[in-house]
Amino acid sequence: MRGSTTIRARIMPATSRFPTAPFAFACLLGLLALFGLWYGIGQPVTLADAATPTHKLQCASYTPFDKDQSPFDQPMQLRPERMEADLALLAERFECLRTYSVTDLEELPNMARKHGLKLIVGAWVSRNPADTAVEIAGLVKIANAHPDVVQAVIVGNEALLRKEVTPQQLVVLIEQVKAQIKQPVTYADVWEFWLKHPEVAPAVDFITIHLLPYWEDNPAGIENALHEVAEVRQTFGNAYAPKDILIGETGWPSEGRQRETAVPSLVNQAKFIRGFVAMAEQNGWRYNLIEAFDQPWKRVSEGAVGGYWGLYDADRQDKSILAGPVSNLPHWPTWLMISLALAAAALLWAGRPHSPRAALLLPLLAAVGAACIGLFAELTLVTSRYVGEWLWAGALIVLNLVVLSHGALLLSSRNGWRARTFNWLHSRGALWLTLSGFAGAVMMLALVVDARYRSFPSAALLLPALVYLCRPVGGYRREVALLALLIGACIAPQLYQETLSNWQAIGWAMTCVLLVAALWRSLRVKAQAA
């Protein structure tokens, strides 16, 4: 079909027979597809339990922030009632907790004692000597005041990784603390930094290493993650004997972007944690799991993935990571209902299809549109952090609704208000396509230039790409050509840096290929119309 701003509809006569068979078949197919999509994502998986009412785990990282709090918001007041409730909950499954700072945590040892918990207390070491001195003094005070609760202390967390202190400065701080307390003293960092700075090891009483396969320079997928952890732990055990080794952080994220073969999900988090606990207890390793609760504030600096390492969510609800069946999307029936309602609304909006072929395509379009909007809305709830990100995501959802409305009316027997609405939408078809191309260019550039913490928004642009690839619209020739070239030029670099083992990146690249094809076809429509 040719043309850029108008389209001649093939109107089915009012007396013609409704194409019931193809329409019903397509509706059934769309229904099954939506059910299969959401059930496939959310189906429960049964794994061997890591924790039981009679078997507690060793230790978990604990930061006492509520879901609306962040250490970046100063001054900040910690909530004693929150800490009290947290410790009561964690005492059901853990023997000890690890903390990272002593600021405003003077009462934490008393609360821990009340609930039968031990503590590994950390002092936050930073590039500011005055702040570090306050932390060290507080650490010594807490350790000496509560020797029955504080079983070890950690002087600094990944300070060498952040390059905030030198190894020599760190050793001085460690020796300073060792001279004033009786508990064992250690320093905690990613395992590579112990190898890069061997001069720190003689100063500590035991070695504390962080093993996070997801964050490795060469990320390990869930299938190989435990093997990698075991190899590093064995290497350190042999290299530093007779000093003990504490795995100070290990875990897996439940949400966020894929890194090579490492895929964040609730099921993968449960697989890793349960498998690791079994392996650690079989080998007699000391360990601390990261972390007790999801920390939304970490998304500011680490993207969506940073906020979802908890064994419980930010509302202190069990994520089923330690025991019981686990689902990647526990509320999948809700998303299924939303998608079905959206698909039904699209069918009602379109009304009577204009031909038997349209009767087959219309329900499928409605299902694809409902799936894309639902998937992107679910992603938005996970990734959006600021007002600007919420507005951007909201604009993309509105754009998808407009494109779905346009596409549905393309297949409709239009009369009355449907004809008027279609004419308004179709006369602006070039605008909807250009806006889709602009969004694609912005997100593609971000994923090429600053990809580390960004998720792949494939669902946001798949519907516009498909609709305008199948039914091209002309207009804005110069802008469309520029957007097509820009997106197309970024596809190969984006895939190269993500590697072909990243199926999320491949999905985004394929979406962009479809979008570029739609943009390119619109240029041909313009040329034909001229």
Identify the residue ranges that each predicted region occupies.
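Substrate-binding cleft of secreted/luminal carbohydrate-active enzymes
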Residues: 58, 260-323
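Conserved, mostly hydrophobic/aromatic
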Residues: 60, 97, 153, 207, ...
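N-terminal carbohydrate-binding/catalytic regions of secreted carbohydrate-active enzymes
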Residues: 61-134
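Substrate-binding cleft of extracellular glycoside hydrolase catalytic domains
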Residues: 108-184
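Aromatic- and acid-rich polysaccharide-binding/catalytic face
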Residues: 115, 121, 151, 189-228, ...
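Aromatic-lined carbohydrate-recognition surfaces of secreted/lumenal glycan-active proteins
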Residues: 123, 177-195, 242-249, 285-295
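Active-site clefts of carbohydrate-active enzymes
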Residues: 211-219, 238-269, 294, 298, ...
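Alpha-helical transmembrane segments of integral membrane proteins
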Residues: 353-530
